[in-house]
C-alpha cells in the first residue's frame, strides 16, 4: 500500500510524515476500510494535524507564543490521545471560532474529524477506552433559505426554452 493518498498522482498530497502514527493509521483506515475519498481522508488528516498542534501548545509542550504553523504535530503517542478531555475539545472549538475565525460549518467539520478519530481509536483499533468527543455536539448551523426565481425570471427561462434546443416543447414542460 502506498503512503500517498493519491497513488496515480503522488505529488498531489504529501506522504503522511508529519503526524503521529495513530493519525496516520486512522487516515489509512479511512481510505482503505471505510472507503472515503482521498480528498476526504486528506482533509481529516489536516484537521487532526491542526488539533495536534493546538494540544501541544495547550499542554505546554511548545512555547505558548509559538505560531501554529511552526509547531511540529508529530510526537504524540496513544497515551497522549487518551489524556485528552472534553474540556480540551471545547477549548479547541472555542479557539477555532475566536482565534481562527472559523464559521460554524467549518468548526462542525473539524469536530466530525475528531469524532471519527476517537471512534476509530475506541471502537475499531481498541487503543483507547474513552472518547472525549462522545458528548460534544456540533455547533448549531444557520439555516440557509433557498434562492428562488422571480415570476419574471421564470417566464424568461420558459421563453428561452422555446427558442433554443432540439426539443423546445419538452424543454418548456
What residue ranges belong to the model's regions?
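Conserved catalytic core of the tyrosine transesterase superfamily
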Residues: 1-173
Amino acid at each position: 500500500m502506498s503512503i500517498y493518498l493519491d497513488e496515480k498522482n503522488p505529488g498531489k498530497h504529501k506522504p503522511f510524515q508529519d503526524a503521529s502514527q495513530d493519525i496516520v493509521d486512522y487516515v489509512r483506515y479511512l481510505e482503505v476500510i471505510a472507503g472515503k475519498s482521498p480528498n476526504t481522508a486528506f482533509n481529516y488528516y489536516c484537521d487532526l494535524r491542526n488539533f495536534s498542534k493546538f494540544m501541544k501548545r495547550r499542554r505546554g509542550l511548545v512555547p505558548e507564543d509559538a505560531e501554529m504553523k511552526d509547531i511540529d504535530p508529530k510526537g504524540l503517542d496513544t497515551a497522549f490521545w487518551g489524556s485528552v478531555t472534553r474540556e480540551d475539545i471545547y477549548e479547541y472549538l472555542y479557539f477555532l471560532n475566536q482565534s481562527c475565525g472559523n464559521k460554524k460549518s467549518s468548526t462542525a467539520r473539524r469536530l466530525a474529524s475528531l469524532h471519527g478519530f476517537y471512534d476509530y481509536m475506541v471502537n475499531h483499533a481498541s487503543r483507547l477506552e474513552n472518547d472525549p468527543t462522545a458528548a460534544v455536539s456540533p455547533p448549531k448551523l444557520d439555516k440557509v433559505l433557498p434562492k428562488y426565481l422571480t415570476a419574471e425570471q421564470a417566464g424568461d427561462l420558459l421563453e428561452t426554452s422555446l427558442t433554443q434546443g432540439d426539443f423546445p416543447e419538452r424543454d418548456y414542460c
